[in-house]
Protein backbone atom coordinates (compact mmCIF):
# COMPACT_ATOMS: atom_id res chain seq x y z
CA UNK A 1 0.00 0.00 0.00
CA UNK A 2 1.33 3.44 -0.87
CA UNK A 3 1.91 5.88 1.95
CA UNK A 4 -0.27 8.93 2.16
CA UNK A 5 -1.09 11.16 5.13
CA UNK A 6 -4.32 9.19 5.51
CA UNK A 7 -2.72 5.74 5.46
CA UNK A 8 -0.03 6.93 7.87
CA UNK A 9 -2.69 8.26 10.29
CA UNK A 10 -4.52 4.92 10.14
CA UNK A 11 -1.28 2.99 10.69
CA UNK A 12 -0.34 5.20 13.67
CA UNK A 13 -3.79 4.83 15.25
CA UNK A 14 -3.76 1.07 14.69
CA UNK A 15 -0.28 0.64 16.16
CA UNK A 16 -1.47 2.55 19.23
CA UNK A 17 -4.70 0.54 19.43
CA UNK A 18 -6.94 3.59 19.14
CA UNK A 19 -9.56 5.10 16.89
CA UNK A 20 -8.68 8.03 14.67
CA UNK A 21 -8.75 11.33 16.56
CA UNK A 22 -11.13 14.11 15.58
CA UNK A 23 -8.18 16.02 14.11
CA UNK A 24 -7.19 13.01 12.00
CA UNK A 25 -10.78 12.62 10.83
CA UNK A 26 -10.96 16.33 9.93
CA UNK A 27 -7.82 15.90 7.82
CA UNK A 28 -9.46 12.92 6.10
CA UNK A 29 -12.64 14.88 5.37
CA UNK A 30 -10.53 17.75 4.02
CA UNK A 31 -8.71 15.37 1.70
CA UNK A 32 -12.02 14.00 0.44
CA UNK A 33 -13.32 17.52 -0.24
CA UNK A 34 -10.10 18.27 -2.11
CA UNK A 35 -10.47 15.03 -4.06
CA UNK A 36 -14.05 15.90 -5.02
CA UNK A 37 -12.89 19.29 -6.30
CA UNK A 38 -10.07 17.67 -8.25
CA UNK A 39 -12.41 15.12 -9.82
CA UNK A 40 -14.88 17.84 -10.80
CA UNK A 41 -12.07 19.88 -12.36
CA UNK A 42 -10.71 16.85 -14.25
CA UNK A 43 -14.18 16.09 -15.62
CA UNK A 44 -14.73 19.69 -16.75
CA UNK A 45 -11.30 19.92 -18.39
CA UNK A 46 -11.84 16.61 -20.18
CA UNK A 47 -15.29 17.69 -21.38
CA UNK A 48 -13.85 20.96 -22.75
CA UNK A 49 -10.54 19.55 -23.96
CA UNK A 50 -11.12 20.12 -27.68
CA UNK A 51 -11.98 23.80 -27.35
CA UNK A 52 -9.25 24.39 -24.75
CA UNK A 53 -6.61 22.68 -26.89
CA UNK A 54 -7.64 24.54 -30.05
CA UNK A 55 -7.73 27.87 -28.24
CA UNK A 56 -4.37 27.17 -26.62
CA UNK A 57 -2.82 26.28 -29.99
CA UNK A 58 -4.11 29.53 -31.47
CA UNK A 59 -2.66 31.42 -28.50
CA UNK A 60 0.72 29.84 -29.25
CA UNK A 61 0.46 30.78 -32.94
CA UNK A 62 -0.46 34.37 -32.01
CA UNK A 63 2.38 34.82 -29.55
CA UNK A 64 4.94 32.93 -31.66
CA UNK A 65 3.92 33.58 -35.29
CA UNK A 66 7.12 31.96 -36.60
CA UNK A 67 5.66 28.60 -35.52
CA UNK A 68 3.19 28.78 -38.41
CA UNK A 69 5.63 30.07 -41.03
CA UNK A 70 8.77 28.05 -40.33
CA UNK A 71 8.90 24.88 -42.43
CA UNK A 72 9.75 21.62 -40.75
CA UNK A 73 8.29 18.70 -38.88
CA UNK A 74 8.37 20.50 -35.54
CA UNK A 75 6.44 23.58 -36.58
CA UNK A 76 2.80 24.32 -37.36
CA UNK A 77 3.27 25.51 -40.94
CA UNK A 78 1.29 22.55 -42.32
CA UNK A 79 -1.95 20.84 -41.28
CA UNK A 80 0.14 17.93 -40.01
CA UNK A 81 2.28 20.31 -37.95
CA UNK A 82 -0.81 21.96 -36.49
CA UNK A 83 -2.21 18.53 -35.62
CA UNK A 84 1.05 17.64 -33.82
CA UNK A 85 0.93 20.89 -31.88
CA UNK A 86 -2.65 20.25 -30.79
CA UNK A 87 -1.76 16.65 -29.91
CA UNK A 88 1.11 17.82 -27.69
CA UNK A 89 -1.00 20.47 -25.95
CA UNK A 90 -3.69 17.85 -25.44
CA UNK A 91 -1.12 15.59 -23.80
CA UNK A 92 -0.16 18.34 -21.35
CA UNK A 93 -3.83 18.93 -20.53
CA UNK A 94 -4.44 15.20 -20.11
CA UNK A 95 -1.54 14.92 -17.66
CA UNK A 96 -3.02 17.81 -15.64
CA UNK A 97 -6.29 15.86 -15.40
CA UNK A 98 -4.36 12.79 -14.23
CA UNK A 99 -2.75 14.88 -11.47
CA UNK A 100 -6.19 16.16 -10.46
CA UNK A 101 -7.52 12.61 -10.19
CA UNK A 102 -4.41 11.37 -8.38
CA UNK A 103 -4.40 14.34 -6.01
CA UNK A 104 -0.70 15.02 -6.48
CA UNK A 105 2.02 15.95 -8.94
CA UNK A 106 3.16 12.36 -9.48
CA UNK A 107 1.68 12.03 -12.99
CA UNK A 108 3.22 15.35 -14.03
CA UNK A 109 6.61 14.41 -12.63
CA UNK A 110 6.64 10.83 -13.92
CA UNK A 111 4.80 11.01 -17.26
CA UNK A 112 5.72 14.47 -18.46
CA UNK A 113 8.67 16.15 -16.78
CA UNK A 114 10.94 13.09 -16.58
CA UNK A 115 12.98 13.26 -19.77
CA UNK A 116 11.19 16.32 -21.14
CA UNK A 117 14.38 18.35 -21.60
CA UNK A 118 15.85 15.60 -23.76
CA UNK A 119 12.68 15.36 -25.88
CA UNK A 120 12.53 19.14 -26.35
CA UNK A 121 16.18 19.29 -27.41
CA UNK A 122 15.90 16.29 -29.73
CA UNK A 123 12.84 17.65 -31.52
CA UNK A 124 13.73 21.36 -31.24
CA UNK A 125 10.60 22.16 -29.21
CA UNK A 126 10.42 25.32 -27.11
CA UNK A 127 9.00 24.99 -23.58
CA UNK A 128 7.74 28.58 -23.94
CA UNK A 129 5.15 27.33 -26.46
CA UNK A 130 3.66 25.03 -23.85
CA UNK A 131 3.85 27.67 -21.14
CA UNK A 132 1.76 29.93 -23.38
CA UNK A 133 -0.70 27.11 -24.06
CA UNK A 134 -1.05 26.36 -20.34
CA UNK A 135 -1.57 30.05 -19.55
CA UNK A 136 -4.39 30.10 -22.09
CA UNK A 137 -5.96 26.99 -20.58
CA UNK A 138 -5.70 28.45 -17.07
CA UNK A 139 -7.33 31.72 -18.17
CA UNK A 140 -10.11 30.03 -20.15
CA UNK A 141 -11.03 26.75 -18.45
CA UNK A 142 -14.18 28.24 -16.91
CA UNK A 143 -13.74 26.56 -13.53
CA UNK A 144 -14.62 28.30 -10.29
CA UNK A 145 -14.16 27.87 -6.56
CA UNK A 146 -12.25 24.89 -5.22
CA UNK A 147 -12.20 23.15 -8.62
CA UNK A 148 -10.51 26.21 -10.15
CA UNK A 149 -7.99 26.33 -7.32
CA UNK A 150 -7.16 22.64 -7.68
CA UNK A 151 -6.73 22.85 -11.46
CA UNK A 152 -4.73 26.06 -11.29
CA UNK A 153 -2.34 24.60 -8.71
CA UNK A 154 -1.32 21.82 -11.13
CA UNK A 155 -1.24 24.12 -14.15
CA UNK A 156 0.97 26.54 -12.20
CA UNK A 157 3.20 23.67 -11.08
CA UNK A 158 3.70 22.65 -14.70
CA UNK A 159 4.24 26.24 -15.89
CA UNK A 160 6.89 26.73 -13.20
CA UNK A 161 8.61 23.46 -14.14
CA UNK A 162 8.74 24.53 -17.80
CA UNK A 163 9.91 28.09 -17.10
Curated annotation (Swiss-Prot):
PTM: Contains one covalently linked phycocyanobilin chromophore.
Task of the protein: Light-harvesting photosynthetic bile pigment-protein from the phycobiliprotein complex (phycobilisome, PBS). Phycocyanin is the major phycobiliprotein in the PBS rod.
Record keyword RNA-binding present: no
Keywords recorded for this protein, A-Z: Antenna complex, Bile pigment, Chromophore, Electron transport, Membrane, Photosynthesis, Phycobilisome, Thylakoid, Transport
Location of the protein in the cell: Cellular thylakoid membrane
Gene Ontology cellular component list: phycobilisome; plasma membrane-derived thylakoid membrane
Family per similarity comment: Belongs to the phycobiliprotein family.
Binding site for (2R,3E)-phycocyanobilin: 85
Record's protein name: C-phycocyanin alpha subunit
Pfam families: Phycobilisome
Species whose genome carries this gene: Synechococcus elongatus (strain ATCC 33912 / PCC 7942 / FACHB-805)
Biological processes annotated in GO: photosynthesis
Keyword Metal-binding part of the UniProt annotation: no
Quaternary data: Heterodimer of an alpha and a beta subunit, which further assembles into trimers and the trimers into hexamers.
Entry membrane topology: Peripheral membrane protein
Amino acid sequence: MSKTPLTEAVAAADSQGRFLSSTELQVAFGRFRQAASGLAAAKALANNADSLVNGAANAVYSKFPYTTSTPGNNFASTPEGKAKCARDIGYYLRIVTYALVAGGTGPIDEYLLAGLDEINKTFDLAPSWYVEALKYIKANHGLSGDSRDEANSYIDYLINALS
